[in-house]
Amino acid sequence: MGKQKINAVVNGESNSTYIIAEIGVNHNGDINLALKMIDAAYEAGADAVKFQSFKSDKLVSRFAEKAKYQQDHTGTNETQLEMLKKLELSPEDHLIIKEYCAKKNIDFLSTPFDEETAIF
């Protein structure tokens, strides 16, 4: 594999591995928990943290039931939309997270799930 460049880090051949800490939605929609997870990733030596960016109502139907594994872990008293809404971070939250990452000198990445969050 040839060399790859992510920000100022060049990977491949004799260079070190670029480590991405996948936070995803494990912050449970809590910005303070997200910041603590960034701290943990930084302390563990990660080069980047990766989140998931989405608008729940653009991701699933309001009639969609939760998948079996979701029901097993979080119960059946809400729809998939209601569950995902709790995991959503606002655009303002993303900016706070991005700025926090810059201060910590750790790269911010996010996987967008819709066009609106990809543009932001």
Predicted features and spans:
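N-terminal amphipathic alpha-helix/helix-capping segment at the start of soluble metabolic enzymes
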Residues: M1-I20, H94
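Active-site acidic carboxylates
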Residues: V9-G12, N28, A41, K55-V60
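Short coil/turn connectors at secondary-structure junctions
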Residues: S14-T17, A44-A46, K104
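Hydrophobic faces of well-ordered beta-strands that scaffold small-molecule active sites
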Residues: I19-I23, V49-F51, F108-T111
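Active-site beta-loop-alpha junctions enriched in small/polar residues
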Residues: G24-N26, F54-S56, F113-E115
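Glycine-rich, proline-tolerant flexible connector loops at the mouths of alpha/beta enzymes
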Residues: D47-K86
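Active-site beta->alpha loop and helix N-cap motifs at the rims of alpha/beta catalytic domains
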Residues: T74-F120
